């Protein structure tokens, strides 16, 4: 199993290009199930999660062709509307085939999902919404089985803000009979990107980006070409890496448009951040000032950046309080950061981080995707060598990580 070896103490400098957003690409790939016509997507990142989903779609009968960052999907013949456990167990986003399959085929059988082990992320909101639209849904032997002749528009209220739930129900509603209204909808930019693609395919959607989304169903959707938005979490991760090392970098093919909460905190920490057209510059001070963090749904501070900010607070001046309000059990990286010398105390959903002068290299273990990123950042700052085990988590969400870090001057390589 591969590991990542980092020789710390190097100030990051230079330029790197940001990839397309994994969390936008995954639902948009699933949206291709809604039409018999080809859908072409560009700026698709080359990641393990993307490969897993493309393999799953292929098993269902979708013809997939890929040329680097361009993917064309032809779902004219779906002959197997099933997502088996073997394909689903490593990736929670596979639940996103449920809505499109039910809407298009009238039936779906999808294994309950896996993915990062960061607490309970139930699919009950997906099921409740499909039931309100007329589907008969059962959960047996680890599978969600949904059947309907045609979905009917309905007024849906999610008990909690759920990104994948909003996406699943929005896709399902595109082919429903009548109007569907999703209240308490997720407002994330990735939801908007999905809506933009669906509209290009002929869907009638309004309100994406607000907490009330309206979808008027149509009889059929068309093919389309769509460019996946830049990955705001990858962008934030590299900004944090530069900030932690006292570096100065320029990130291209990205924007601060969806990163206000992250950029504000980096500036509070002492960084200069300049937005250019399709690029961001960051210049960090010699040592950061600690910043308090509270995660909340978009447009507030994203939970997917919590671990990275724990890493930069670990070497900042002062003490910081980090509150995680989205997921339970999302402080598993704290123990690994402590192995590097970080001073962190956990009390329920709150972490108190007292910045230290320096971290020391050690062997640490990644526990989930964003936790892996925090360990990379800490390893870049630490004195000596840091070895990160179980980096398959990183391969799920960061395209060409070693190559991009090396372009910024980091001493990092993959080892067996």
Swiss-Prot record:
It is an enzyme of class 2 (transferase). It holds the Pfam family EPSP_synthase. The modification 2-(S-cysteinyl)pyruvic acid O-phosphothioketal is found at residue 116. Phosphoenolpyruvate binds at residues 22-23. GO terms for molecular function: UDP-N-acetylglucosamine 1-carboxyvinyltransferase activity. Keywords: Cell cycle, Cell division, Cell shape, Cell wall biogenesis/degradation, Cytoplasm, Peptidoglycan synthesis, Pyruvate, Transferase. One of its GO terms (biological process) is peptidoglycan biosynthetic process. This is UDP-N-acetylglucosamine 1-carboxyvinyltransferase.
């Amino acid at each position: 199993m591969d590991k990542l070896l980092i020789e710390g103490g190097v100030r990051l400098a230079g330029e790197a290009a940001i990839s397309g957003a994994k969390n936008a690409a995954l639902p948009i790939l699933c949206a291709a199930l809604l039409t018999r016509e080809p859908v072409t997507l560009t700026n698709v990142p080359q990641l393990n999660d993307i490969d897993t989903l493309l393999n799953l779609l292929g098993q269902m009968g979708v013809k997939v062709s890929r040329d680097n960052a361009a993917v064309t999907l032809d779902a004219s013949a779906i002959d197997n509307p099933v997502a088996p456990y073997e394909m689903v167990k490593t990736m929670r986003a596979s639940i996103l085939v449920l809505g499109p399959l039910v809407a298009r085929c009238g039936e779906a059988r999808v294994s309950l999902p896996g993915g990062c082990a960061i607490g309970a992320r139930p699919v009950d909101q997906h099921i409740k919404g499909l039931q309100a639209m007329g589907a008969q849904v059962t959960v047996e032997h680890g599978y969600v089985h949904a059947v309907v002749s045609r979905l009917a528009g309905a007024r849906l209220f999610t008990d909690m803000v759920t990104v994948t739930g909003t996406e699943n129900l929005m896709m399902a509603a595109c082919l429903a009979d009548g109007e569907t209204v999703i209240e308490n909808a997720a407002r994330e930019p990735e939801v908007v990107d999905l809506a933009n693609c669906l509209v290009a395919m002929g869907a009638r959607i309004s309100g994406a980006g607000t907490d009330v989304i309206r979808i008027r169903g149509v009889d059929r959707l068309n093919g389309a070409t769509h460019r996946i938005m830049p990955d705001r979490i990858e962008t934030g991760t590299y900004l944090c890496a530069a900030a932690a090392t006292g570096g100065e970098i320029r990130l291209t093919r990205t924007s601060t448009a969806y990163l206000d909460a992250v950029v504000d905190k980096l500036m509070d920490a002492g960084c200069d951040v300049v937005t250019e057209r399709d690029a961001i510059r960051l210049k960090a001070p010699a040592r950061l000032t600690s910043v308090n963090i509270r995660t909340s749904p978009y447009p507030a501070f994203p939970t997917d950046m919590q671990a990275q900010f724990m890493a930069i607070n670990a070497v900042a001046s002062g003490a910081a309080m980090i509150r995680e309000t989205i997921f339970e059990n999302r402080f598993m990286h704290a123990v690994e950061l402590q192995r590097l010398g970080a001073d962190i105390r956990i009390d329920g959903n709150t972490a108190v981080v007292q910045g230290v002068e320096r971290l020391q290299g050690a062997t640490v273990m990644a526990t989930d995707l964003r936790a892996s990123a925090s360990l990379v950042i800490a390893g870049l700052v630490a004195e000596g060598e840091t070895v990160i085990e179980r980096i398959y988590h990183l391969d799920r969400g960061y395209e060409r990580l070693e190559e991009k870090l090396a372009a910024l001057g980091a001493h990092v390589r993959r080892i067996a």
